[in-house]
């Protein structure tokens, strides 16, 4: 490809909507263009990289015996009604009606469709195990699209589903996909960590999330450096604080004007935040989007409520619980915003974190403006409807496995695998007959990769970008080599550039020739910005048969003969183009 003929434009300025390096660089490098909020188009160079990621995924899926199919993005609502998710899924689902009023959705996921496919064709244990996958567009009506493809409304995912006769078969399929995902993300040049995760809206009995580690990620993981514990914050079990051995003091109502936050009341009363009680207020909704209850959740003042744990404790869908309208909840339950405590609350579900019964003499809101109560004790002064772990695991908290201090890291969720069991096969009637002609529900697994997210997350790795632009790994780079022709009108330089271009192409190297009539500085800046791994510069040395050879990851440039440069480029590309060299690092 010649850059002069390519649909290609770079930006010098940072687009206003871009906040993180990967989003900034993809827009500046002309890899993507914004169509609307959360909707992007892939330009030629971006599309080349995207295809390479897809092909790596296909190679690893095929190697595990998975077969590729393609299903419609438009999914009938009745399939989702069979699984029970049509009413449970929240406003993120795009719903449409056809001219006859029949409900459809733009698929945010594909469990129902794949289950429908196999229930009609798999009838015998002899047909199991089976594994099918697709790479296709997905749609979610994100309330606040941001960070480019990290949280977009239209994105590409790889869906993979395994179908087994029993849990042992599922365990084997799950292990194979765990290994395949490790290979995919390694070959793409990601620094990542598999962690235990909550199953969320997908459901099932077990899950791992693959998190690409970078400071800009929205996911937070917990891990222990002493043992093998690694988990998302949402999934992490917590060790309760040691019970306090102290006398229960009499409750004392105190005036605390204007102290609506934990920090303010702790400072005003000169107590540690650990000695306070934090309240979070919620309202829950029924299937008709009407408020059907209120919830007050209490944790120690220095902690945060873990919404995943709270949702699981209440047995509600994550879309059916939101922060309460405090004015309405005050009228119904007696709470007061900023001064809510458990004493005096009524007509709401009270959830207490599991460590609260062991603490003594806490400061809590008095359910009265500008007042708190000192020396509030669980059991004597208040009780909860549910006592369960609903707190986040904090940095430095003891590991629930070995007791060593927990560490936190941020990252981007690029993939997740689930043990679905019979969550979908039972309600949808996907069964098989065993050797004795007895019917059993098919045992399923679900495995997803965010292809769009992976595309962007690669750049957010610290080693894959710098102040000048992208540094693509060879395995996913749009081209392996860029030839920068300094003077296209110079006959000798042009002949040398053409020779390199032709010989590299014949050797299977993907090469782009920058033959634009631009200033050398513009060409160098663009080559750095788009991140092609190898740059060969053809300039004044061409008359003596010399070129300049530079790796994008390295600062040094070396002068080589034309033949040496060609040979070195071919050797480097062949060693790195499939990404398997990362396994040796």
Where are the regions that the model predicts?
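NTP/phosphate- and nucleic-acid-binding module
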Residues: 1-585
């Amino acid at each position: 490809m010649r850059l002069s003929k390519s649909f290609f434009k770079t930006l010098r300025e940072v687009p206003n909507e871009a906040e993180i390096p990967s989003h900034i660089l993809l827009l500046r490098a002309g890899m993507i263009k914004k169509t609307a909020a959360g909707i992007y188009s892939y330009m030629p160079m971006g599309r080349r990289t995207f295809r390479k990621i897809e092909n790596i995924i296909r190679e690893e899926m095929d190697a595990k015996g998975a077969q590729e199919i393609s299903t419609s993005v438009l999914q009938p609502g009745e399939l989702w009604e069979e699984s029970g998710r049509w009413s449970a899924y929240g406003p993120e689902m795009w719903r449409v009606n056809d001219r006859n009023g029949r409900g459809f959705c733009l698929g945010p996921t594909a469990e129902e469709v794949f289950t429908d496919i196999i229930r009609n064709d798999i009838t015998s244990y002899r047909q199991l195990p089976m594994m099918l996958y697709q790479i296709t567009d997905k749609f979610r009506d994100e309330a606040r699209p941001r960070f480019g493809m990290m949280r977009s409304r239209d994105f590409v995912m790889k869906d993979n589903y395994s179908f087994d006769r029993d849990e042992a078969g599922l365990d084997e399929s799950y292990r194979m996909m765990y290994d395949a995902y490790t290979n995919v993300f390694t070959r793409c040049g990601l620094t990542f960590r598999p962690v235990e995760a909550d199953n969320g809206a997908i459901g099932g009995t077990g899950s791992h999330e693959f998190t690409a580690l970078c400071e800009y990620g929205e996911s937070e993981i917990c891990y222990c450096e002493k043992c093998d514990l690694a988990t998302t914050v949402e999934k992490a079990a917590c060790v309760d604080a040691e019970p306090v051995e102290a006398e229960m003091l009499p409750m004392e109502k105190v005036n605390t004007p204007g102290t609506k936050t934990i920090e303010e009341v702790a400072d005003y009363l000169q107590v540690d935040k650990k000695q306070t009680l934090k309240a979070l207020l919620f309202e829950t909704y029924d299937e008709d989007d009407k408020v059907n209850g209120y919830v007050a959740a209490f944790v120690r003042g220095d902690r945060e409520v873990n919404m995943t744990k709270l949702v699981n404790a209440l047995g509600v869908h994550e879309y059916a619980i939101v922060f309460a309208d405090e004015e309405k909840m005050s009228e119904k339950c007696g709470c007061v915003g900023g001064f809510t405590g458990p004493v005096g609350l009524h007509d709401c579900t009270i959830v207490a974190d599991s460590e609260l019964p062991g603490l003594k003499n806490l400061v809590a809101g008095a359910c009265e403006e500008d007042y708190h109560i000192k020396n509030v004790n669980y059991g004597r002064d208040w009780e909860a409807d549910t006592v369960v772990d609903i707190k986040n695991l904090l940095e430095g908290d003891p590991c629930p496995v070995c007791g060593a201090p927990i560490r936190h890291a941020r990252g981007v969720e690029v993939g997740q695998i689930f043990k679905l069991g019979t969550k979908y096969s039972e309600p949808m009637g996907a069964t098989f007959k065993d050797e004795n002609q007895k019917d059993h529900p098919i045992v399923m697994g679900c495995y997803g990769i965010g292809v769009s997210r992976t595309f962007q997350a690669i750049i957010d790795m610290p080693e894959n970008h710098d102040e000048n632009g992208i540094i693509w790994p060879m395995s996913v780079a749009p081209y392996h080599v860029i030839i920068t022709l300094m003077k296209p009108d110079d006959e000798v330089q042009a002949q040398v550039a053409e020779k390199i271009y032709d010989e590299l192409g014949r050797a299977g190297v993907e090469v782009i020739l920058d033959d634009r009539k631009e200033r050398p500085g513009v060409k160098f800046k663009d080559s750095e910005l788009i991140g092609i791994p190898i740059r060969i510069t053809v300039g004044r040395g061409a008359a003596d048969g010399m070129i300049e050879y530079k790796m994008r990851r390295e600062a040094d440039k070396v002068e080589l003969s034309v033949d040496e440069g060609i040979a070195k480029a071919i050797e480097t590309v062949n060693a790195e183009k499939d990404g398997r060299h990362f396994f040796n690092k």
